[in-house]
């Protein structure tokens, strides 16, 4: 177990998020194995492991060092075809999966959650090795949310159902909620385990089958979970996992004529491509959770200490690699100077380093491409006239670490105020009135999330209604629960994940009407 100082550090991390997971337990964190053994690096189809048909592999890299962890089978169109064929067979009428009681689907999901909990320490270490996020976060935050998500949807398995309908005439009418069928799911690298759970939970609870493409940057934890899916007792073909690249494996899923639905989390640019491919093929249903440039509005009456800490967390959590990061911090002018001063001090105190060290708050960026992209945005900010207040460069000689960076005097037209940076770069903007900040906050192609910090309930309610965003947090940030839907307006995507709303995208509603001799009330 971690010593008391390490546990205190874990508690500090959780206080920053102030219940990112709605009710994160403060608990002892087992010491990690910093070199976890790699058990699975192949393609998972029909509950079996396969090399890629092409025999190609790709390296997955430790972002803390730049060293190759291992090579992983590189799936492409032929492998996706084989996975879809297996999924389609598992979905045939009369198959073991289709014949399974809804309550038993819930039992399997609960069993999967139990197995993940059993191997939680290993999975947290593997996630940190492959992704770079602090181990304390992997264990206390990501894995906790994974377990809650799977167990939440396990509970829905036998409770999401149709209705009887009192139509006119001598008829009996009712609805059925039926599974869509073969669901293609494409998950990102910033929260590999969590995004896998967000996708699998509602799909499996409602009786679908899955072909999942995992990110080439972070395939390892998803592949380990694949083996737990088999151990839990899911029939062959119900879940198939293909590691590979977006332009090959991802594109094959999006355009496949025998895939009934695709769910994607990632960039808006790729979301466009998936939407087009889905439309050009078989008009498959699409759920997209895309980019954001979320406004975080600090009113002059806000609790300053809390607002500074939460604004810091809103931007820097997960190395800034969050689609809903509070990446436009709007501060009312009469507290602007003090807020900026405190925010810079907080950023300078942020501990960057080895993600397996319990004191670390910030690990590396995911890869060299993102590392260079973020440094390019920092250069752009300086060139366009924003004031660099701290950070601005690499934080280590090895790996993809970037200093916590804060810009002041940011204007709406600057590149760093318009585009998603996806890194530890905070932009602070000044405003005068509520009406002004509403207009500026909504003047974005994105609409994923927003936040308001104020002690005035009228202001909070007014801003919550006015902001064009799928989620608005009041006096908090990044508070998620499996019960609450998440998704975006505008170019931040379509559809919702989590909660009861998250089940809708995975079901078809069928109306059945039966002629009866006589209907009585």
UniProtKB/Swiss-Prot annotation:
Q: Which residues carry this modification: N6-acetyllysine?
A: 56, 77, 163, 372, 379, 387, 430, 432, 445, 455
Organelle targeting sequence: 1-21
List, from the UniProt record, the residues annotated as the active site of this protein.
289 (proton acceptor), 323 (nucleophile)
Keywords tagged on the record: Acetylation, Mitochondrion, NAD, Oxidoreductase, Transit peptide, Ubl conjugation
Q: Which reaction does it catalyse?
A: an aldehyde + NAD(+) + H2O = a carboxylate + NADH + 2 H(+)
Q: Where does it primarily localize?
A: mitochondrion
Q: How does it assemble?
A: Homotetramer.
Instruction: Indicate what this protein is called per its UniProt record.
Output: Aldehyde dehydrogenase, mitochondrial
Native organism taxonomy: Eukaryota, Metazoa, Chordata, Craniata, Vertebrata
Its gene name is ALDH2
């Amino acid at each position: 177990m971690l010593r008391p100082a390490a546990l205190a550090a874990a508690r500090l991390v959780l206080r920053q998020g102030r219940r990112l997971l709605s009710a994160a337990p403060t608990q002892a964190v087992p010491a990690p194995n910093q070199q976890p053994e790699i058990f699975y690096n192949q393609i998972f189809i029909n509950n079996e492991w396969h090399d890629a048909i092409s025999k190609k592999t790709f390296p997955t890299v430790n972002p803390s060092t730049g060293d190759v962890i291992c090579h992983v089978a590189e799936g492409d169109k032929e492998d996706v075809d084989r996975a879809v064929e297996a999924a389609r067979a598992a979905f045939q009428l009369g198959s073991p999966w289709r014949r399974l009681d809804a309550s038993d689907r819930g039992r399997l999901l609960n069993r999967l959650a139990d197995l993940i909990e059993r191997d939680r320490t290993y999975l947290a270490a593997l996630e940190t090795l492959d992704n770079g996020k602090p181990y304390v976060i992997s264990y206390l935050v990501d894995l906790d949310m994974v377990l809650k998500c799977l167990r939440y949807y396990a509970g829905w398995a036998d409770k999401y159902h149709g209705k009887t309908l009192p139509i006119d005439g001598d008829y009996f009418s009712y609805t059925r909620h039926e599974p869509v069928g073969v669901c293609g799911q494409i998950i990102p690298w910033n929260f590999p385990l969590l995004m896998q759970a967000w996708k699998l939970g509602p799909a499996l609870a409602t009786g679908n089958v899955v072909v999942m493409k995992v990110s080439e940057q972070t395939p390892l934890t998803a592949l380990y979970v694949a083996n737990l899916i088999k151990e839990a007792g899911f029939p062959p073909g119900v879940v198939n996992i293909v590691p590979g690249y977006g332009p090959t494996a991802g594109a094959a899923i999006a355009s496949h004529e025998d895939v009934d639905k695709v769910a994607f989390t990632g960039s808006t640019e790729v979301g466009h491509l998936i939407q087009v491919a889905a439309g050009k093929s078989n008009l498959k249903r699409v759920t997209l959770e895309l980019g954001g440039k979320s406004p975080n509005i600090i009113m002059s009456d806000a609790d300053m200490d809390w607002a500074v800490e939460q604004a810091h967390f809103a931007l820097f959590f997960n190395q800034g690699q969050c689609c809903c990061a509070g990446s436009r911090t709007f501060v009312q002018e009469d507290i602007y100077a003090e807020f900026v001063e405190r925010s810079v001090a907080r950023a300078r105190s942020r501990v960057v380093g080895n993600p397996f060290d319990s004191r670390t708050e910030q690990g590396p960026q995911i890869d060299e491409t993102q590392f260079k992209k973020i440094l390019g945005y920092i250069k752009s900010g300086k060139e366009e006239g924003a004031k660099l207040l701290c950070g601005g460069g690499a934080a280590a000689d090895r790996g993809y670490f970037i200093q916590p960076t804060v810009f002041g005097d940011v204007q709406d037209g600057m590149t760093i105020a318009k585009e998603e940076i996806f890194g530890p770069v905070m932009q602070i903007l000044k405003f005068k009135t509520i009406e002004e900040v509403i207009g500026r906050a909504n003047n974005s192609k994105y609409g994923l999330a927003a936040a308001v910090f104020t002690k005035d309930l009228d202001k909070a309610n007014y801003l919550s209604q006015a902001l064009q965003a799928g989620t608005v947090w009041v006096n908090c940030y990044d508070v998620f629960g499996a019960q609450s839907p998440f998704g975006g307006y505008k170019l931040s995507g379509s559809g919702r994940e989590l909660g009861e709303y998250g089940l809708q995208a995975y079901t078809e509603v069928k109306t059945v009407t039966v002629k009866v001799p006589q209907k009585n009330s």
